[in-house]
Amino acid sequence: MELGNFVTDLNGKKCVKCDKDAKFTGVDPKKAWYCQECFVQMVRNKFRSSLSKKKIYKDADARDTLIVFDGTLSGTFLLHQINDALKQITYKRLMVKPTVLVLVSLTEDTEIQMVIKRIQEIKKSVLENVRWVVAHLACSMYDEDFKLKENECNGVEKISDYNQLIASCSVPTYRKELERVLKEKCLQKIACSMGILKCMVPDHADDLGRLAIDQLCLGRGGSISTLVTVTDKRPDFMLIRPLCDISKKELAVYNYLCDIDKHCIHIAQQNNQQKSVQTLTDAFICTLENEKFYSTINTVLSTAAKIHNTSIGKDDSKCSFCNVEVADSVCSTCSAIRECTGDLLTLLF
């Protein structure tokens, strides 16, 4: 039987948590099946567990957190989890002081204005008493402190510089990696400009599993643990990935069942998919999943979490651009990216 685009099964399966008929499954349909109520609770528990295990908010003075909303199904899920957690009046209440960052990569002014208008509507029903800020990925190009304004898209004056830098990278693989690193720099600069030390991003398990393989191919195998696990601590900034154990499929089913996918909006620029390490990784994972190797992502992530760099970076030396542990000031991948950009990257950073 099909419910929307989500596979269900009514042929005698029982929920693993209660005695009701099971209709929904997680990543692997050969394993646990759930009724609707237990499936929703299972996904919520994964989110809360990722935060509680690391005791991220044990310090009462460091609860200010930037919540990144990128318009995707995972971004929508994250937004609603924070909203629900703040409404709790028991021990389940999440002790966090959120500021929502709407991260945009669109370049047309009319599209950006439509996003701002849509955000005004969403704010009426989700986190209405929280500060919202709209910013473009081009904020990564600021070389000095800047003040964020409300009710407008910050960083639009830097879009041409951002596009010029991305276009200057001639190798598709390095271009995609440059975009990823610039996104992290954008988040860090925005957080620092607001005096916030923590940033919660909507990266789900599928994204992180693919990222782990990408980074192996780019020669960063010793650093993939920090890139795909819950916390990524940096000198003045921490990235938090509370969706790292939740698959894209689970998020899609949850959003559908809870009727929150209506808050997904188009924020990201669609780029031409030239052949690169990243596109090949995606094709490789899709092939395995189509051949019913459902646990591929889980296996990759569980293995990646155990890999730690023991030969270099013992003195906490980091790449000055991407922040991975290296023996030198710049990792080999970032050095290659700098060469591809014709030294434009060196001039800017």
Swiss-Prot record:
Quote the cellular component terms of the Gene Ontology held in the record. Answer: cytosol
**Pfam families the UniProt entry points to:** CTU2
One example of the protein's molecular function in GO is: sulfurtransferase activity
Listed InterPro entries: CTU2, Rossmann-like_a/b/a_fold
Keywords (alphabetical) are: Cytoplasm, tRNA processing
- BP terms from Gene Ontology: protein urmylation; tRNA thio-modification; tRNA wobble position uridine thiolation; tRNA wobble uridine modification
Recorded metabolic or biological pathway in which this protein acts: tRNA modification; 5-methoxycarbonylmethyl-2-thiouridine-tRNA biosynthesis
Q: Where in the cell is it found?
A: Cytoplasm
* HAMAP family the record matches: CTU2
The family assignment reads: Belongs to the CTU2/NCS2 family.
What this chain does, per the entry, is described as: Plays a central role in 2-thiolation of mcm(5)S(2)U at tRNA wobble positions of tRNA(Lys), tRNA(Glu) and tRNA(Gln). May act by forming a heterodimer with tut-1/ctu-1 that ligates sulfur from thiocarboxylated urm-1 onto the uridine of tRNAs at wobble position.
Q: Which PANTHER family match?
A: CYTOPLASMIC TRNA 2-THIOLATION PROTEIN 2
Put simply, this protein is called Cytoplasmic tRNA 2-thiolation protein 2
UniProt source species: Caenorhabditis elegans
**Gene transcribed to yield this protein:** tut-2
